[in-house]
Amino acid sequence: MASKKGNRIVIKLKSTESGHTYTTEKNRRNDPSRLELRKYDPIVRRHVLYRETK
């Protein structure tokens, strides 16, 4: 039986400097555009910009 498509989806956040990725969830209704967050990148050992990828 197919379930109803929910508002929350799993996305990948990719570092703009090293290529490191985080996975997180976002709400389709509240955040329809691509997400950009500053998070810690363990490869370059500092906070950098992470952008949502498909």
UniProtKB/Swiss-Prot annotation:
InterPro entries: Ribosomal_bL33, Ribosomal_bL33_CS, Ribosomal_bL33_sf, Ribosomal_zn-bd. SUPFAM superfamilies: Zn-binding ribosomal proteins. One of its GO terms (cellular component) is cytosolic large ribosomal subunit. Pfam families: Ribosomal_L33 (PF00471). Keywords: Ribonucleoprotein, Ribosomal protein. PROSITE patterns: RIBOSOMAL_L33 (PS00582). This is Large ribosomal subunit protein bL33. One of its GO terms (molecular function) is structural constituent of ribosome. Belongs to the bacterial ribosomal protein bL33 family. NCBIfam families: PRK00595.1, rpmG_bact. It comes from Chloroflexus aurantiacus (strain ATCC 29366 / DSM 635 / J-10-fl). GO terms for biological process: translation.
